[in-house]
Amino acid sequence: MSKRYRESENDEGPSSTGTKKTKSSDGPLSKYTHGDYTVGWVCALSKEQTAATAMLDFRHGDLPKTSSRDPNTYILGSIGKHNVVIACLPEGEIGNNVAATVATHMISAFPSMRVGLMVGIGGGIPPKVRLGDVVVSTPVGEYPGVVQWDMGKATEGGSFQRTGALNKPPSSLRTAIGRLKTEQELTGSQIPQYLDQMAKRYPNLAPKYLRSDSLKNILFKAGHGHISKAATDSEAAPDENSTEEAYDDDEEDDEDEEKEACRFCDKSQIVKQTPRDMRIHYGLIASGNRVIKDAIFRKKLNKDLGGQVLCVEMEAAGLMDGFPCLVIRGICDYADSHKNKAWQEHAAAVAAAYAKELLQYVQPDDVDGERPVKDLLKQG
């Protein structure tokens, strides 16, 4: 029997609740080999990697490094009938180029890898997309699912023309999306159940990674910039930062940020939204090397791309050509000046849960039919 379909001696079996438990990899090395892993899962932040690891059905033991020049650390396990390798960008580093480097090392270390998932958080484009929703990259018109919005050239008249084209997600993953959509329409998504399982297996994750009443879905009108505390508690000033702030800001402000986000902002400028459940959206993701924290710029970018953008993020474009992957983003902010970290863990969890659900419908034979990613790199 293929190692894809059996449990390792280091794997922990199903729990009494019927869900499979993961196990720490502090024990002996895995009985699997580097050639047994076909699905690569890339995260940008450690909180995204935490959510990904929590979604594994089984945790495998570690494997020895294949190269001393590979700086990545890998978390190994399985979801359904697929062996999965998870890697995260180095702490404090973000962007397309860093993501591409991590993926390149992963591909070299795991020669049988055929498909990839880029799973994590992103900024949503309102009004269609809301906090806590999931956006999945799928081809739209001339775009393959992800467009690098900051790659191009200046043209006559001062306009900006985007150049180059990225690859579409692997066909085995796109085929599975069609089946998943049907099953979700018939019986609903399994994401809530996967989140409940995560909370039972890892209770310490529940306070941040599950949605709670403390998470407020607040959208301000585009013309109302964030008002932050100035030098004294009695003063307030507009936040002039626009696009130069990374997702992980200074830790010292986290506690105040979550408790007092938009404390000084004009509440009359909040857009009224009818309450609804989490939704999954399929379409265009705009990727660039700068964090977007400006509602006016967000609207212009969406308009320039035909009004088709659902999400903005920073890593996907660096992967799409050399690492055939599907990009899955949980929405944690609206890419405006009111951006804060409150929703990040929950957004990471729903994105990881969607990836887990999708893999249930990805056929192993279809994955085996994809060309090894290392061969695609050699061809390129």
Task: Name what the model sees in each region.
Residues 2-380:
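Intrinsic-disorder/coil detector with helix-boundary
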